[in-house]
Amino acid sequence: MKRTFISAFLLGGILAGTHLSAQETKPASALKKGPNVSLNITNKKKFPPRTYVNLGLFSNYSCLNGLGINAISSLQHYNSYGMQISGFTNVSGLKSTGVQISGIANVTGKRACGFILSGLTNVTGTSAYGLSIAGLGNISGGDIKGVGIAGLVNVSEDTRGLAISGLANVNKDIQAGLIIGGLMNVSGNSSRGVQLTSLLNVSGKSNQGWQLAGLGNVSVENKGVQTALLNYSVTNRGVQLGVGNVNTKNSSKGYQIGIVNVSTDSTAHQIGCINLKPQTRVQMLVSGGNANKASLSIRFKNKYTYTQIGTGAYYLGVDNKLSVTGFYRAGVYHSLTD
């Protein structure tokens, strides 16, 4: 009798452990249960239970596989597949695939795929694929692939595709595609494609496409094209087009085209009014003659070429109006002596 009791006890423990282990294999719900004021058509025989039609004021249920329309909010503990529409917020604990439309926010714990539209923000934990449109911002913990349109900001680890924002596009790693920001575009690693903004483009590591800005472009290594009022790169192996172009590392064999070009590499190719390299000799010249009674100029002399900018006066008397001239010269030279 004693042996029978011990055997039954051990068997019950094994069965209980088996039951607990089976429960642990089920995916954990990311959200807590809450009030549900809606009409639902649900299949409870599956885990998690599938809701195929959901109509109500606000809903809180396991999984949507179909159509959900709510006046206030819609919350799924697991996944949402189909169309999810609410007046204020849509929340999916894990993944959403299909259409999400809300007045304030769409929030997905992991990945969102499809068409996502909100009055304020779209938030995804890992990635957003498809078309995301928000009045305020699109925010993704991973990447945005496809099209992201926001009134203020698009923020993600990577962006690949088309990103349009009224204020800024900010990425931790890579921007690839067409990136249009109202004021600035920032990529922590590299930009591949086109960065277009009215103020500033910044690439934390390299620019491998085209940076086009109204004020300035900044990159550690430029392998593409920079076009702005001011362009800066530590290493320039591409083309800089602007009023002022600067690169500060010796291994820069790209092209600088602008008014003022500054490079620490003696082999850099420069086309501009003032070209400065390590071997550039800066000379101040004072002269006079028939054309100018007196003139003062600065000459920037490189290995075979020079540029010169200065000012002078035709007449220095006091009985007539003073005339002032400005001039610029560029040319090539050959030294007659070593």
Regions found by a protein language model. Name each.
Residues 24-338:
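Surface-exposed, glycine- and small/polar-enriched segments that build interaction surfaces at terminal
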